[in-house]
């Protein structure tokens, strides 16, 4: 069993009672896991949307998710002075698999970044929590002694989400394209749009935010005030280069090109926008997270490996919590997952200096902040997904990386990064600045 005091694996065998003897073998304590550093690409408005200034989006539309992941991995290696030869495993989240080579996922991203072909690589999906899950999975590998250095991250290109035709297998042979003029008879499906609907509960993701807001008494005014604050904080972070140290360029596209934020947002202007699901809805284009393209990656190591390498880690991973909940209120996932992570860490809300809560929707974030009893001055202090956007699998890694840098910047100790997850889940991670 796992000793709750020292996290050592204890194996024992009890002999017959007449033999007064107990055999015990204690394995070495599990390694602590540290976040050495990382990098992310700019998060840029998708091709189908409009930037905050009203211009058409799509700065990253021609970079597949795998290419963005490759760039983020390269950036993480460079920013941490980590040799590709020292990497034991690559774990990358990829939720909305949109490119023609998507099935190869982390493998192509890692090989493209120069990781040796002998290194195993894993692609995973916990949808919006994938970027945190990849860090959890990497940490578990290290704690079990299967690796010492892991690249964890997430990658997404929403611009490349295809329109698809289902039910064509009985008409066209493998590898043969449909003839022009015949394909529309079956009906074309928007792959991005259909994946915003959870068929298990019959709700769009935005409707789960409306549902939890209804249950928790969140108002439209509170929602738009939070959204305006997110836009303002995001603009401040871009203008004052707060995120510059974590961003790696994609070609000539850098941290100043993060373009979803609407700089002149006020609660009054946001309050004039039409809601998505009728008069009872709170969700609008101005208080929901942006659809953007981007990727992020971090280098995590065992504490002993980091010490031997002469690293100066940003933080150590303290605990994590992953939960399931009613699909119709998936947006509430940060609350039970954060409580679980804090309980495992032996910490309370008062111990946490900074929170990074994914703003899938402003109303959902307000509900979580209120229910956890958080001080808004400690939450998403540099902006969040309403302002910067939410590239699904990449978001969680950005939350953790941004949190680690912010704890250093603010001289804080403990922080929590958390996200809701489509389908009815939540994930949270507690880290401690070093």
Task: Please identify what each model-predicted range represents.
Residues 210, 246, 253, 318-387:
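Active-site pocket-lining segment
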Residues 28-95, 99-109, 113, 208-220, ...:
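Conserved active-site "lid/cap" helical segment
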């Amino acid at each position: 069993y796992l000793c709750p005091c020292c996290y050592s694996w204890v194996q024992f065998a009890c002999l017959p009672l007449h033999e007064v003897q107990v055999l015990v073998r204690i394995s070495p304590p599990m390694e602590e896991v540290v976040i050495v550093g990382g990098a992310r690409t700019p998060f840029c408005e998708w091709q189908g949307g409009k930037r905050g200034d009203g211009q058409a989006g799509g700065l990253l539309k021609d970079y597949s998710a795998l290419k963005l992941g490759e760039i983020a991995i390269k950036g993480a290696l460079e920013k941490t002075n980590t040799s590709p030869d020292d990497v034991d495993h690559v774990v990358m989240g990829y939720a909305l698999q949109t490119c023609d080579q998507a099935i190869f996922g982390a493998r192509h991203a890692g090989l493209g970044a120069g990781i040796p072909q002998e290194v195993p690589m894993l692609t995973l999906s916990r949808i919006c929590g994938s970027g945190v899950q990849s860090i959890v999975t990497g940490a578990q590998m290290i704690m079990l002694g299967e690796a010492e250095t892991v690249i964890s991250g997430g990658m997404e290109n929403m611009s490349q989400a295809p329109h698809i035709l289902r039910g064509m297998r009985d008409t066209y042979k493998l590898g043969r394209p449909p003839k022009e003029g015949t394909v529309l008879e079956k009906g074309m499906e928007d792959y991005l749009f259909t994946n915003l609907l959870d068929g298990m509960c019959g709700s769009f993701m935005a409707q789960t935010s409306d549902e939890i807001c209804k249950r928790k008494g969140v108002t439209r005014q509170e929602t738009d005030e939070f959204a305006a604050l997110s836009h303002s904080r995001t603009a401040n972070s871009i203008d004052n280069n707060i995120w510059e140290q974590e961003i790696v360029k994609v070609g000539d596209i850098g941290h100043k090109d993060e373009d979803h934020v609407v700089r002149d947002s006020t609660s009054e202007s946001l309050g004039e926008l039409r809601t998505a699901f009728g008069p009872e809805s709170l969700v609008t284009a101005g208080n929901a997270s942006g659809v953007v393209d981007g990727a992020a990656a971090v280098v995590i190591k065992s504490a002993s490996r980091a010490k031997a390498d002469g690293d100066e880690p940003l933080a150590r991973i303290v605990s994590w919590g992953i939960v399931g909940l009613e699909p119709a209120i998936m947006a509430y996932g940060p609350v039970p997952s954060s409580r679980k992570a804090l309980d495992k860490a032996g910490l309370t809300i008062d111990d946490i200096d900074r929170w990074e809560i994914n703003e899938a929707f402003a109303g959902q974030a307000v509900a979580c902040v209120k229910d956890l009893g958080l001080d808004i001055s400690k939450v998403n202090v540099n902006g969040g997904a309403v302002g910067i956007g939410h590239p699904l699998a990449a978001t969680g890694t950005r939350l953790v990386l941004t949190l680690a840098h912010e704890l250093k910047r603010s001289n804080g100790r403990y922080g929590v990064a958390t996200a809701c997850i489509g389908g009815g889940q939540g994930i949270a991670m507690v880290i401690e600045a070093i």
